Amino acid sequence: MAPAATAAASSGKGSFDLATLFVADKAARDEAGLALADAVKKSGVEFFTQIGFNDAIVKALNDKKSQSAREGACEVISTLCENGAAQLLEPHVISSAENTPFPALLEAFADKVAAVKTAAIAAVKAIVQSMNPWASFVLLPALLNLIRTSGKWQIKAGSLEILQQLITSAPYQMGEAMPDLVPVLAGAVWDTKSDVKKAAKATLEKAVSLVENKDIEKFVPALVKSLLNPIEEVPKTISLLSATTFVSEVTAPTISLIAPLLIRGLDERPTATKRKVCVIADNMSKLVDSEYTVRPFLPQLLPRLIKTAETIADPEARSVANRAIVTLRRIGKVPVESDGSDLPPLPVAEGPHLATNFVALVKKHGGVSVEQTNPGLAYAGVLAASLVNHHNFDQKTWESTLPPYLKLALPSYDSLPAVRELLQKKADEAETDDAKFPDEEEGEDLCNIEQFNLAYGAKILLHHANMRLKRGHRYGLCGRNGSGKSTLMNAIINNQVEGFPPPTEVRTFYVQHDIDGSEAEISILDWVLSDKRLLATPEEIKSTLESVGFDEVKQKNSIGSLSGGWKMKLALARAILFKADILLLDEPTNHLDVLNVDWLINYLTSLTRCTSIIVSHDSDFLNRTVTDVLHLNNFKLKRYPGNLEEFVKHVPEAKSYYQLDVAEDYQFKLPNPPLLDGVKTKEKSLLKMRNVSFQYPGSSIQQLYDISLQVSLSSRVAVLGPNGSGKSTLVKLLTGETEPNLGGQVWKHPNLVIGYVAQHAFHHIDNHLDSTPLEYMLWRYQTGEDLEEMHKANRVMTEAELAKMKEGATVIKDGVKRIIDELVARKKLKQSYEYEVSFKGMSSAENIWISRDELVARGFEKKVMELDTREAQRLGLMRPLVRREIEKHFEDFGLDAEFVSHNSMRGLSGGQKVKVVLGAATWRRPHIICLDEPTNYLDRESLAALIAALKNFEGGVLIITHNREFSESICTEVWAMREGHLEASGHNWVEGQGSGERIDKKAGDDDEVEYDALGNPIVKAKKEKKLSAADKRKAKKDRMARRKRGEEVFSDEEL
């Protein structure tokens, strides 16, 4: 037993009788502990070192013969923490020094004397409750190691109790440590000792309460079950989780619960389970904000994903796995050649090194010289290392955490300047890829938002993004299709961006794609005057309209009579009158000809007080207009100064915004057309227009004058001309959208299929926005015909045509008067066709065949065209309308199966909608593809892919576009429209078949694939070639010669 002695403290000499802390009398021990607390508060942090406190505590804890020594050592720790000396004690107890008492305190959890064990747990709890939360990372490794490896169940149970206290005292820090916590706790739940098992379960339940992700809160109990009972629960939990849409940030607590499930799920046998795991991994990884969050799980998760992608049989599931791999590689910054298991260790900040930095910085900022070994300074270095290693560079956190401990070493020194400089240095080292530009602080701020989020429905678009806009700047908003460019613009105008200035402070105007079709009858002037938001007088409005090309006559015209280009100019005129601070322009060059694009560039660059945000896929326009680029990528918004060329220097991988290069992994594929009856070369005309004139009903001006032209499989036509010159009208006549009304004739091959995408491409899907692309396709082609064809002018009967058909429906056969009911079937008749006709009130046995010319003469031309279309479908043009085939078709246009089958079209971006329209138009394997302004909503990557696909297409191509780069890269023939007149150049119009290569029989070509009723390909037996008499004689002669040589040879007859 230690000798009794009176407590004596001398702050001047730095002495204290430590033996008094370990005496048998508890009251005396308590009095000595209080005296020590008073002494150290007066003398400072180095007092513990001067009196040899740590050595004495460790010696007492290891004194197996003295219960009072062991109990007293634990009690004095609690007394110091409870009496205001905790901050002075921390640097000595929580450090990496060899003589720290903390390991000995943990070993005391297994003391045979219950009082000592209780005192030890109370002491550690007191330390944990009073210490700085960032010290948790110093204590945690020792606790987890004991839970995992200790042979004494009391130590395990006690450590688990301390962990529970840590979760209460330092929730954020323990959340960050969850990747280390969860595996240890999941293992401890299966301990053989029931006390440990019970404590581990309670600790795990408390730990998972740190998960604050709203997406998975309701699944936490299921996730815990899958950790504890993986064989039974993993498949169930994966099914539950696969239906979840992740929109909240995925942090360390969330991923530490989900990652073990994914790792185990990839070891399951069913392909469906593996696919679900890949979907979860992909969706979850997109919302991980830092590589450090996902790094602990990469060595196990990524190799399994790679193995799944290489071994799984289902190609669609393989593509999902590959997508997840790409996302994980990007988030974790894993090189292509690595599978994540051989990554170099992350840099680790060391406490002593940062303490050395503090010594230098204190001296630099006018402080007195201080030893690096000073406990307060050394401990500040340890805490700074914890902050750096967990990537916390928040100024408030650093300023509240470190100065109190630096003050222990330098009581009269203001350490804030030194702390801030070290913070800046470490933050710069950690964020080398997030360069700031020197002009960041120049100019007047219109908007400066930090840390905002943006989602569209269930899809996250921006996460913790920043946006700073300067007055007079022109920002080009760049990003891939579907990255959220138009959604961000809509969110700004609808006041849905948190922190964006309200309309009362900053006037913002959105120049939209198109003008509402419901206002088609309103005159242009009245439409502009009716807008109450415009700060302009009627005179100003008229003069502004004149300045953009609307003279007095045009101002009185209805909006419905305007072409796409003029509608866009009208929307821009309204934007000018709005006098906005911020102008949002979404594809402003759509439908504009070259002269109007130049006018727009001059107008935008002349604005000095107005800021513009521009979304455009016209790289030349952006290059000549913008002063900065806002890059929307990986859920962030990053500003780069300069135009598009300068931006590409900073971000080389964004070259696709500037150059029309086809990416190897991103290509479109157009289905090649089948053969047509009577068409033996690509030069033979399939579509003709002869002396056609046209004028819209109600219009005072004729649109087309005496147009003659023809189109064949070899045609590559660019239809050019200024806005309003009749380009779209010409194409509508060719495709049957409208019909000639001032004379002339349009002829097309009976079996010809045309794939048409209109100028306002979205009108094809406007009434189906709440359907998925799959549902839209199933609706459009449900009868085997294209239901959009049914609404074309050349399929709708006029009153005059109905009267003519009624008059011509009477047929006299064998003296009996019959009335034609329907056209039933068709067959070849010389150079034309004849049609089987049924009669009203008569059986099918009475049907007769009538030639095409006679039926046309009787007024049945549109009925003939209807049957021709049906027959064209039947003759092999039709494809099985099943989900797998539709998904594969859209995949050829860069649209994933996820969007085709599971996303409504309302939620798709403009570029994705264009891909749906293109895919739907080409489903029937058209012979001629007709595209009216196809480049409007496609990004550069998709545009390059479309150009390559059109070049390889075996059919004819007609393109209306103002994009010269696009037309020149494809087209060899030009139809120039000028005020309704056509000037054709570069064409090769022939009568008959022409002299080109024959396409009706190509050497080595197999017959076209035919399908049965279930959509399965029919494998035809190969025809055997019959031998001629000469061949038979030659074979016989050969057999005789071989027999003569002694070989055994038999013919089929002999066998």
UniProtKB/Swiss-Prot annotation:
The ABC transporter domain is annotated at 447-659, 687-1004
Compositionally biased intervals (Basic residues): 1033-1044
| An example Gene Ontology CC term for this record | cytosol
Q: Where are the HEAT repeats?
A: 45-86, 96-133, 135-172, 175-213, 217-255, 257-290, 295-337
Could you state one GO biological process linked to this protein?
A: cytoplasmic translational elongation
User: What's its EC?
Assistant: 3.6.4.-
- Which keywords, in A-to-Z order, does the entry hold? ATP-binding, Cytoplasm, Elongation factor, Hydrolase, Nucleotide-binding, Protein biosynthesis, Repeat, RNA-binding
* Compartment(s): Cytoplasm, Cytosol
Q: InterPro entries in the record, alphabetically?
A: AAA+_ATPase, ABC_transporter-like_ATP-bd, ABC_transporter-like_CS, ABCF_EF3_subfamily, ARM-like, ARM-type_fold, Chromo/chromo_shadow_dom, eEF3_ABC2_chromodomain-like
Disulfide bridges in this chain: none
Recorded GO terms, molecular function?
Answer: ATP binding; ATP hydrolysis activity; RNA binding; translation elongation factor activity
Write out the ranges of the annotated region (Disordered): 987-1006, 1024-1055
> Pathway, according to UniProt?
Protein biosynthesis; polypeptide chain elongation
Whether RNA-binding counts among this entry's keywords is yes
| Reactions catalysed | ATP + H2O = ADP + phosphate + H(+)
Q: What does this protein do?
A: Ribosome-dependent ATPase that functions in cytoplasmic translation elongation. Required for the ATP-dependent release of deacylated tRNA from the ribosomal E-site during protein biosynthesis. Stimulates the eEF1A-dependent binding of aminoacyl-tRNA to the ribosomal A-site, which has reduced affinity for tRNA as long as the E-site is occupied. Assists translation termination by stimulating the release of nascent protein from the ribosome by release factors. Appears to target calcium-channel protein CCH1 to the plasma membrane.
Name the family: Belongs to the ABC transporter superfamily. ABCF family. EF3 subfamily.
Tell me, how does this one assemble? Associates with ribosomes.
This chain belongs to the protein called: Elongation factor 3
Q: Which organism is it from?
A: Cryptococcus neoformans var. neoformans serotype D (strain JEC21 / ATCC MYA-565) (Filobasidiella neoformans)
